[in-house]
Amino acid sequence: MRNFEKAFEYINQAIEHTPTVVDLYVLKAKLYKRAGDLRRAATLYDEARKLDLADRYLNAVASRYKIRNDQVKEAEETMALFSKETDGSLNVHDMQCMWYESECAAAYLRQGNLRLALKNYNFIEKHFDQIYEDQFDFHLYGLRKFALNAYFEMLEMEDRVYRNKYAVRAALGTIKVARRVSKLNKEEESAKLKPEVEEYKNSKEYKQIQDEIRKKDDDDDFKNDPDPRGYDLYENFVSLP
């Protein structure tokens, strides 16, 4: 019926009657989303999250709504409440949290930050490459354990792994970035990017990341990412003919 005026009237009465029910704030946030007010929807989801700080699902949805409202930094801080390492860094990439990467990439693309949009789409691409490569570890295991049903299901899944919605979104998103880059003056973009790259590579953050990578003995591509801000990736992308 899309009678938002009546819907808000009833939901406000319900919240006034029992202001501690989380679901009421969630429903009101959804109403604002349907009405097209993402800013208010994100605020209400954050209010709902604060009523139950132990609810991981609410935390994730509140983060999603913040990203869709282009509040990426605030969303990262919210996600960090449940998804961070001992050093305080987010582990969403290590956990293959593709919805988060996809939403962040789309937000950065809307903001015109092609570097970080490309980096987040690249994270998703790496996840699927890793999933595809991991099948080789399962070949001998599946045959040795005679788990043929699971083995054949795995083979069928790997044949269509790149049809996954996140793989498709990442591919289309990368194409959108490429189209935006193709419209730029590449010489000017490279000249503008060069001092940013030099400043970042001389920063304390970058040097600390490189020192930590040298100390680690695992081969995790996400924990040992030498280019977490996507400067090298974007610089190479811009230099393509």
Listing of model-derived features with the role each one plays in the protein:
Residues 21-23, 55-57, 73, 98, ...:
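Helix-start (N-cap) detector for alpha-helical repeat units in TPR-like alpha-solenoids
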Residues 176-240:
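Acidic, serine/threonine- and proline-enriched intrinsically disordered linkers and terminal tails
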Residues 19, 53, 87, 129, ...:
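Short coil turns that delineate tetratricopeptide repeat
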Residues 28, 61-62, 104, 154, ...:
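Structural register within alpha-helical repeat arrays
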